[in-house]
Amino acid sequence: LADTHPAASWLPVDPSARAQAIRGLVFIAANCYPMITIIDYPERFVSDLGDDEALQKRVRAGTRKTLHRHWEMFADLFPARPFLNGEHIGALDLYAAVVSKWSGTRAHVAAARPAFDAVLQRIEADPRVAAIFAQHWPPK
């Protein structure tokens, strides 16, 4: 998508910054998104889970803890400049902003990595992003 529509600036032009953004996209896809799937569907990953509510709760809690640890690592590895993509919002910013909305991540990073939480809030505050997010996550 970034190569087909370079004017959209989905990824940075600088090769080093571009590689870092791609690394960030892969990090979220490989480390965060799978944890959300386990939290949402633990029965797909634990064969004996059945209707055992206590076990389901433990699987979800342990997986959520791992997910939040992964977001802490992400925050430490991918600093904003002022956005994750660099000077303007790009693919990594949007992906991080969306995936971090699930499984209690925002509350966790607000406490554990407030600077990263501020980046996510900056991304969400962009009028283009805010309009889309309002459709999927209406203000409370």
Specify the residue positions occupied by each region the protein language model found.
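All-alpha amphipathic helical-bundle segments outside canonical DNA-binding/catalytic cores
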Residues: W10-Q20, G62, A80-L92
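GST superfamily/GST-like fold recognition
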Residues: N31, I36-D40, L84-V109, R122-I123
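Residue-level signal for nonpolar/aromatic packing positions in well-ordered secondary structure
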Residues: A21, F74, D93, I123-V129
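Extended, well-ordered alpha-helical scaffold segments
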Residues: G62-T66, A112-A125, V129
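GST-like domain detector, emphasizing the conserved glutathione-binding G-site
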Residues: L1-R58
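Surface-exposed helix-capping loop/turn segments at secondary-structure junctions
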Residues: A7, D76-E87, R128-F133
